[in-house]
Amino acid sequence: MQVTETLNEGLKREIKVVVPAGDLEAKLAERLETARGRARINGFRPGKVPTAHLRKMYGKSFMAEIVNEILNDSSRSILAERNEKSATQPEVIMSEDEKEAEKVLDGKADFVFSLNYEVLPAIEVKDFSKIAVTREVVDISDEEVDEQVKRIASSTRTFETKKGKAENEDRVTIDYLGKLDGEPFEGGADNDAQLVLGSGQFIPGFEEQLIGLKAGDEKVITVTFPAEYGAAHLAGKEATFDIKVKEVAKPNELVLDDETAKKLGIESLERLRQVVREQIESQYGQITRQKVKRQILDALDGDYQFETPQKLVDAEFNNIWQQINFDLQQAGRTFEDEETTEEAAREEYRKLAERRVRLGLVLSEIGEKAGVEVTEEELQRAVYDQVRRYPGQEKEIYDFLRRTPDAVANLRAPIFEQKVVDHLLANINVTDKKVSKEELTAEDEDAASEAKPAKKAAAKKKAAPKKKAEEGKSEEA
């Protein structure tokens, strides 16, 4: 096999490979001889089938197998010999001339093909011990825990029908019909809807107009949907709602005791407080870690500048772009609604894709140099967590993961990255800073540098007056 480098520009490589017809013939002769000893063909004794007869019957199919084996093995062997790592699976380019292909299969022509690929850039790990980050820490007060316990326990609160007017914290049962310009709109109606006044369950201005109503009262209220409302056809629009009050109920006293905790599946009130404190600590801890990680990534981004494999960047950009367009479509919005243009958005997300790829390569190199590994136990736990997300489909998901190495690799990657971040945290300068929970959870304008850019399509909301909590999705690097 003759290997010749025909392109070496930056990270791009092109390798021409020529397998002489004589080499192919030698491999075919060896395969025919092996087959001759096993062949069972009518008219011939076992092991005595003439090679020429076997060649006539199986020559082309055997040669096709040989060619495929060469293609499968060549990338790995050539990269190993050149001491290179390909960023993606090398692209194989062969002649599309059918006559030429027939000559190769007939053993009358050399097998010629090219490998096109990009190499992973050589990265020299720099001294990261000088990186300094600030870790924000929140002291969790007993009052905050008790407040959260009350919110959780309020789901067990009972209500008692009353005859008077509805007040704040009362529960009203209503029928409502929403209209735009006098016409009902989809998703804007419900019967026997229960609403605790003051809970903020419905859009602003809705609940306040129900205060003072009694069972049997009917009223038409006017509200304006928030400008950022997820359903684009309702955002910023004024709507009316025909309201019929069917019941007003006052809340009974909320008792916080062991019995209340048991209704929530917790053995005691003390244990409930402990669980709530742990949940708050975990929530704040995740935010803190994200902020610290962002500082680390920003520091690394400033320290490492090198050419990135364009195919990796293209793949990352395509993933981002697909998600962005899906978000916009779901929300019924356009780039203009997001105060940008498609061209500007493409440029912005392209930069984000390049940053992610570059930082991913840096973290990978740091982890490799530090001997960071994902254990089988950690990977199995990730597989279990993934399978558990699909109740009723556990077997199908498990089988899919078992036969799809790339899917398992996608589970391994974030574990590896988190362990590399842990390694960095143990070797850089970390200063703890006490902050309030408001400071910790404040919107970070720079978050786009490691997550999605600030201009982002909002999640679609149901076209009803109920507010839906949006869950933020942070994507690393």
UniProtKB/Swiss-Prot annotation:
Lineage top rank: taxon: Bacteria
Classification via Gene3D superfamilies: 3.10.50.40, Trigger factor ribosome-binding domain, Trigger factor, C-terminal domain
Domain (PPIase FKBP-type): residue spans on this chain: 169-254
Gene Ontology MF, one: protein folding chaperone
Catalytic activity annotation: [protein]-peptidylproline (omega=180) = [protein]-peptidylproline (omega=0)
GO cellular component: cytoplasm
InterPro entries listed in its UniProt record: PPIase_dom_sf, PPIase_FKBP_dom, Trig_fac, Trigger_fac_C, Trigger_fac_C_sf, Trigger_fac_ribosome-bd_bac, Trigger_fac_ribosome-bd_sf, Trigger_fact/SurA_dom_sf
Composition skew (Basic and acidic residues), residue ranges: 467-477
Ranges where the record places region Disordered: 435-477
Transmembrane segments: none
Domain notes: Consists of 3 domains; the N-terminus binds the ribosome, the middle domain has PPIase activity, while the C-terminus has intrinsic chaperone activity on its own.
Function description: Involved in protein export. Acts as a chaperone by maintaining the newly synthesized protein in an open conformation. Functions as a peptidyl-prolyl cis-trans isomerase.
Alphabetical list of NCBIfam families matching this protein: tig
Protein's name according to its UniProt entry: Trigger factor
